[in-house]
Curated annotation (Swiss-Prot):
Pfam families linked to this entry: CAT_RBD, PRD
Free-text domain note: Composed of 3 domains: an N-terminal RNA-binding domain that prevents transcriptional termination, and two PTS regulation domains, PRD 1 and PRD 2. PRD 1 is the target of negative control exerted by EII-Glc and PRD 2 is the target of HPr.
Mutagenesis or variant effect for S19P: Loss of antiterminator activity
UniProt-recorded name of the protein: PtsGHI operon antiterminator
Domain PRD: 69-174, 175-278
Any one Gene Ontology BP term: positive regulation of DNA-templated transcription
Natural source organism: Bacillus subtilis (strain 168)
Homology family: Belongs to the transcriptional antiterminator BglG family. GlcT subfamily.
GO function term, MF aspect, one: RNA binding
Gene: glcT
Length: 281
């Protein structure tokens, strides 16, 4: 980037808001960058460690408000964590992560200090759905624990993995959470239908979960799916429990996503359910 920045507001010793001729308002981060700075002071290009742009005025206000109750050390930890996520994924992140993840980390640390362990009922589903994000989230938890001298619970890995996935895909966190909850609901239906406890570490379970993940994406995009009619009839007759359960899952998907689902999806779900319940590799 070329050109200098003009200080608009110092948020703390390490974070300030500045204006730039090309990017309008930006947030600059750097050790001591805000110390002694006043409005309209000039900061030369490369006189900072990190920069991000909050284009939305609402998000700018949220970030400023966030820094009113989050101390500088935690902001530094959050910035280091986000920088690590960006490097590990080699992918641009939605800038909202600076607000959402910082806020989450602040409350996670507060809960830990108060001795409150927040359970994550969708941990296994999150790990199965987003394995890469989950691995990075584990690294993030290790960083936070080391820098803050804490031992955050395992469930936080799942929560942070969802924040990472949200930032990578530009999808609202509420939508990402909905998919994890939907997955857990579908697994309950499967266990109830087959009167079994699913082994969530089995290869066939992972295949099923990932298949459902991509099924959800196809449904949301309304992508057509080829319908193998002969195979559908065969599965319906040979494996009625698997086939009927597949349709139960499809009806839940239709109701939750409010989108039509092609009949062909029942075929592929039936095959995955058969493999899962018969432990076929």
């Amino acid at each position: 980037m070329n050109g200098s920045f003009t200080v608009k507001k110092v948020l703390n010793n390490n974070v300030l808001i500045a204006s730039h001729h090309k990017y309008s308002e930006v947030v600059l981060i750097g050790k001591g960058i805000g110390f002694g700075k006043k409005q309209d002071d000039v900061i030369e290009d490369k006189g900072y460690d990190k920069m991000f742009i909050l284009k939305d005025e609402k998000e700018q206000k949220q970030f400023k408000k966030l820094l009113d109750y989050v101390d500088e050390k935690l902001v530094d930890i959050s910035n280091d964590v986000i920088y690590h996520i960006s490097n590990r994924t080699n992918h641009s992140l939605n800038e909202h992560i600076h607000i959402a993840l910082t806020d989450h980390i602040a409350f996670a640390i507060k809960r830990q200090q108060q001795g409150f362990d927040m359970k994550n009922p969708f941990l296994m589903e999150t790990q199965s759905l987003y394995p890469e994000e989950y691995q990075i989230a584990k690294e993030v938890i290790d960083m936070i624990n080391e820098k803050a001298g804490l031992c955050l619970p395992e469930g936080e890995i799942g929560f942070i993995a969802l924040h990472i996935h949200s930032a990578l895909t530009n999808r609202p966190l509420s939508e990402v959470n909905q998919h994890s909850q939907l997955m857990a609901q579908l697994v309950e239906v499967i266990e109830d239908s087959f009167q079994m406890k699913v082994n969530k570490e089995s290869v066939n379970y992972l295949r099923l979960i990932r298949h459902i993940r991509f099924t959800i994406e196809r449904i949301k995009k309304e992508e057509p799916t080829k319908e193998p009619e002969k195979l559908m009839l065969l599965l319906k007759n040979e494996y009625p429990l698997c086939y009927n359960t597949a349709w139960k899952l499809i009806k839940i998907l239709q109701q939750t996503l409010k989108k039509p689902v092609h009949e062909a999806e029942a075929v592929y779900l039936t095959l995955h359910l058969y493999r899962l319940t018969n432990k076929i590799s």
